[in-house]
Amino acid sequence: MADLLGLSARYIDEGIYEGPGSVNRVTTELSEISSDIAVVEAFSHVVTFKTGDGLVLFDTSLEAFAGGIKDNLRAWSPEPVNTIAFTHGHVDHISGAGTFIKEAEENGNPRPRFVGHENVGKRFDRYEMTNGYNAIINQRQFGGGGAANLMGNERGGGKPLKISRFGPSEWVKPDTTFSEKLAMKVGDTTFELNHSKGETDDHLWAWIPEHKAICTGDLVIWVFPNAGNPQKVQRYPLEWAHALRQMEAKGAELLLPAHGLPIAGKERIAMVLSDMATALETVLEQSLKMMNEGARLSDIIHSVKVPGHLLEKPYLRPTYDEPEFIVNNIWRLYGGWYDGNPANLKPAPEAAVALEMASLAGGVEKLIDRARALAEAGDMRLACHLVEMATLAAPDHKEAHGARAEIYGKRRKEELSLMSKGIYGHAERESRKISDVNE
């Protein structure tokens, strides 16, 4: 049983950062936070409360982890599960629900009550409508293995990735829903559920007054807030910052996130919440200021900066999402999809533009050579543009794809965020197959 509170205090108080795996641990290990509170660390954590009338769980993690989570919970408490609250409807938080339903049936206990925001069920319906797309983008985001496989994809030995489905075999929708607020009393414990948009439109955070504790879900994740994911639906940075400020005002003495380490101490918690809110607010304020002045999206992307002292915090490193992506999401939310470049309003096919550029350059080989030179000089953004044009102009050109694999592979290694690494790694693998060049 790890001393998670001691670990988080050391990281925060001393400004220590030992990599993303040190704060987001995937172990299914249960750690007791107090006699009535435990955290099971998994792909997303399960936070559990003893109430005197059964356990209350926040989230169930992924289906693949749920069995181990259940076993470790049972080693801690024999109490049946009374209620499961979904902090939001992402699959890494809800997919293990069936395990706890099955356990209740096998033990002759009542089915757990499932509680969530009214949009959770609508999210599941949307996931079914776009199931193939969600399987593909999660495979790409998480690098084609590991978490992607856990989300419904399968890979045979040496065979191409087989995309089966996204999410659990059966969606368990909340049977108790709410719009803005819901107060629950389970046993001797009160749970005040509050809706706030943030990473999703169906998110809740909970204040548990008897413990002076907050369950944050993904509103706190020990990385830069995931408000810009380039392959996912809309995020809400303004509302996210508001939620963090509301949590800060509670004066909590215990913070229980769904990813990362739990945090104890009123002042320490207030600082973390304030820093996260400030980081979102500064990206939002800079972006909206430039939008209101008529700037193009490209200019805003390359102008908005987050103060370095915030990015150095161990709980604000951009190792999952990053500020540049949040700018794109702010533009989409408040400004639509037209980026300010008239040529992009009704563009020519990308391949046609690439063929024209190759012709002007004197052939695809010229684009390849220049892309490699730019990559060697460290200008990876321009290098990627040119090598992408080369393969669009000549889709079967093995040397072009060899260069594309090299350049995207180099960029993948240099990037910090998992989202960037996933997309560039996917492009690298695509071209390696065509070029017949192994890494």
Task: Locate each region found by the language model.
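Conserved beta-strand hairpin/beta-sheet module of binuclear metal-dependent hydrolase folds
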Residues: 23-77, 205-217
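C-terminal regulatory/interaction regions
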Residues: 2-5, 289-439
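Divalent-metal (often Zn2+) His-rich catalytic cores of metallo-beta-lactamase-fold enzymes
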Residues: 223, 236-299, 303-340
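Active-site metal-binding motif and surrounding structural segment of the metallo-beta-lactamase
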Residues: 23, 30, 64-115
